[in-house]
Amino acid sequence: MIEINNKVDYIFYTNNTPNTYKIKLILLELEKKHSITFESRYINITKKENYSDEFVKINPNKKVPAIVDQTGEKPFVVFESVSILIYLAQKYNTFLPDFKTNPHENSDVITWAVWQAANLGPAFGQYFHFSYFSPTVQEYSLHRFNNEAQRVLRLLDDRLSVSQYIGGNEFSIADIASAGWLLYLNFAPIYKATKERFPHIFKWLDLINQRDAVKEINQSISEGFKTFNPSALRALFTDDPELINAKAPIGIENVVLKYD
């Protein structure tokens, strides 16, 4: 039985990571634009709370983000970040062009939102995992996912050289999907992503950084950097205390790039 809190429109399951920041961002935008209400519930994956019976009822895939929509007669669960973005955008008729009147624009936005989940997110996430959370050095994995991160960054920079926003001429869920990962570049040159190498991405960042909801996400990311702890996550993959407490296998800044 899904726990209900009738005081809010949505229950949002999060752990303050890139994929969950996408959903927090659209919820903040909808809070301002449509006066929706939501409650955040933190799922601590280092304590394996995502495997709890309660959470598995929400998402059988055992991952965040997920939301429970309580605005209807019965609570309705949506999981997978881009699925949530599309669901909310369609429900409130915002951040996604209407298919009936603008089918091509609608398709462009959805394509770039799905592109993020299928390409940018996996490349960034896997490279970051093998850089900081892997108990041992995996050189092949590091180079493979670094090269893929460089490829998707170059592709996105090319896209933004001809389009003000990722999905077209207006801010959309395509931007929200990528923002969950790319807002980190405001604080550190992760993946060697600098303004000199990817000027159009940073121009886009300057543009969306002006939004109030984005400012709030940036604040959360800034606070997260202060408490970054690879050891806690490494403990999910090994019981060896030496590996858990070892220095990260390789620093982001030391990776050899092949797409300079």
Swiss-Prot record:
Give disulfide pairs as residue numbers.
none
Family of this protein: Belongs to the GST superfamily.
Outline the extent of the GST C-terminal domain.
Answer: 102-233
Where in the numbering of this chain does the GST N-terminal domain appear?
7-96
* InterPro entries linked to this entry: Glutathione-S-Trfase_C-like (IPR010987), Glutathione-S-Trfase_C_sf (IPR036282), Glutathione_S-Trfase (IPR040079), Glutathione_S-Trfase_N (IPR004045), GST_C (IPR004046), Thioredoxin-like_sf (IPR036249)
What's the name of the protein? Glutathione S-transferase domain-containing protein DDB_G0274223
Which organism is this entry from?
Answer: Dictyostelium discoideum (Social amoeba)
Q: Species lineage, top-down?
A: Eukaryota, Amoebozoa, Evosea, Eumycetozoa, Dictyostelia
GO CC annotations, alphabetized: cytoplasm
Please name one Pfam family that this protein belongs to.
GST_N
| UniProt GO molecular function | glutathione transferase activity
